[in-house]
């Protein structure tokens, strides 16, 4: 009687190390206990591929996928799934940022785009049972060639398939076999290279662990085609599980008459021995491997001697890697056409190197959500591998680079994400296929340090036989180490390139000629990082500790001494913490609430736990200062006579005014609105930024000597020439970008369509605003969420936000999204408006379409495409488009030479922020387009510095003045305190108490909580 369910437990190295055999034992015991052992079979399979999620269990025939199983999960799983027929969602895979688990294996993105040729038996058979392999057509290809094909026919089929070596060189397999057969001398040897030593690579090991018989069958077919009777598998001794299964497979094949003398009675004899290598990376090179097999030191020899003619013991020898051999039985069984129609092929010439047919196995590792082993068709793009299969970058961080081809492969940037992955295209851009390692790097990876790491690795693995490799790697390692320590000098990059070229031209083996790839590719694609290390003594990724001891401070656009103020909070010296913040930031209360905190993703603690709540601690220090009535006192410079006019009182304008005022300059700010603060005052609701906090900090700006004239519109009430005539020696434009852009759909002129500013401005000015009962907000920004949450507070019964992409791609802050959902706002993802329905010139509804993501736009995000026939109508009476804004430059004098971009922003010198009009500077959203408050403040500080130098008639130095580090003694913690530490949740006003009012939602950290959170800090500054 057949089993009704097969429970396939992954028993690859990754899952075994996570105790998958204990899970298997627990399953068998529980199944027997429940008297299900006649109905349910538990099978230990090879590697499933999704290595980071082990132990893995797949239940067939449904294909239900369970992950990260523990022994304690088993009784419940057996009862629910096997007895009651209810799969267990909590044990299923849930994609990052999503909340809905995916039950079936084939529906998980990691598996969706894979095509299994070499891994065709993955997760299906017990690798320790030859019977399982035979049941999957194992050894039928061998029988076919032995009894119905001549050796030349076998070689011809392999040639037609286009199979190229998967070990790194990519030489056409069929041509290699043919050359070896024609070498004329005997004996001939067949060798499998399983000496996989690349960092982060485990393709060959996993394939042997999962399906060793496919490799043995491929080798035996190859031996028949070549005319060999002896074969060797050269495998690392640190692969114990692969070795164990390989030994078992060879013994089983011999017992079945599939290896040894007179195989299957065919008169063909062939046997295989295992040779355990010592783990030298250079022995992955064919001639070094053969030297090691012979019992000599594993050193390569000159390539003009071909191993197919003079290889092992100077005899004709054919060497292919594990993956190449595993593909051979499939090509024989299913025909060369099956293999050749997958991938890319440039020509029909069978003797050509052109094209890359079939599939390739990659180990996908590094800064990626779904790490593991994948097999994909040649020609798939890097983007599909990294984002569709790999699930993108953890923590919402930005993709930076991917290294293909192992330690001597190239590092490719984001602009090459749409590159098809095949032998030729990778070589064209300075990388290579290699054996299939693929290491993904995010924005926190320093490309100079990456190059240094791989050069150091290769330096240690070089055999030292040839001077270019031995001395070249040593010299490059020394140069790269100096650069990462901040000791680089002009000419270092050029010297690296020169050494690299010498190695490429003259090194003895492929290790030496390819070793410069990490250096050359990072120089080619990330030259600016080398320049930053050498010229500016800065590591942009905040990795090199000699240059950037504290990533948090480095990431702060204002260069605030983060560990300094966090350290003071940890010691209970809150006034000192507030003083440190104010040294670089005139708006601690504002930024403590609405800063987008780029420092937190850089926090080193975030690599192993939650990052420090840096923004919340900033707010705590500011609130403490305000509660204690501490008035900030800033030192002012000597008075100066040159007057400065600032147009706009938003964050950029007020910041520039503050620092110019402290420098002694008379500053006047002209603001169109009746209140100061710009969009801080009229664009951000009180529940996020109370007016009391905003006004307190504006008063501190005024105290520095800044005059703010509200209700004055430049270009109408006063002109540019008036400002010049009134003696202003410099003008700073900081008018922002709040002119709404149209959706481009019909009905936008109807009553009930409101621009965000038409809603938020009167609300923030205390005026009454009426919205309908059913409101639709369009967009995925923080402003869109502000509009939705404001409409909710104004009494709208239903508020729906439409966003045309997925939740993972929504630009709004995650905390804002969750707060909106908690307040009852419905968010329709993958939805876009197509028409505003109008009746009697009023909004009567909104026609929408469902979207799907297909391809990519210029920003690198997936492009939303309407799904045909997916239209539906929302019953709404108010529509608020909040998709994008642009600056309004109508106040600028016509014909005065201001350069403007195609997107209506002002062109400025990036170093000085001076416009094309002498004496006129600009910063903030009017220059960048819609940005963050922190970015505007940073540009305001730079503008103040630039204007000050301009007024003194001096050139502004490119180097920023070095800022001091505050010496704060660390708090000593007990082991018990450390164990209890975790990031606190911000106390908030309950959702049911938010409706109908604009009370602040986030309540601030209590004193004890703030101190405890500050004590979690690793205090990276102390390692300087």
Predicted regions and their residues:
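Ferredoxin-type iron-sulfur electron-transfer modules in oxidoreductases and energy-metabolism complexes
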Residues: 1-6, 18-43, 61-90, 141-158, ...
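Hydrophobic alpha-helical positions that pack around
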Residues: 114, 243-378
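Glycine-rich dinucleotide-binding loop and its adjacent helix/turn
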Residues: 621-637, 696-716, 740-794, 900-916
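Feature captures the FAD/FMN-dependent oxidoreductase FAD-binding
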Residues: 643-647, 695-745, 835-847, 854-855, ...
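N-terminal Rossmann-like FAD-binding beta1-loop-alpha1 element of flavoenzymes
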Residues: 643-668, 784-792
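Rossmann-like dinucleotide-binding cores of NAD(P)H-dependent redox enzymes
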Residues: 666-708, 763, 788-835, 955-970
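FAD-site-proximal beta/loop scaffold in flavoenzymes
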Residues: 749-773, 856-930, 934-935, 971-975
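A conserved FAD-binding loop/helix module that cradles the flavin
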Residues: 787, 923-957
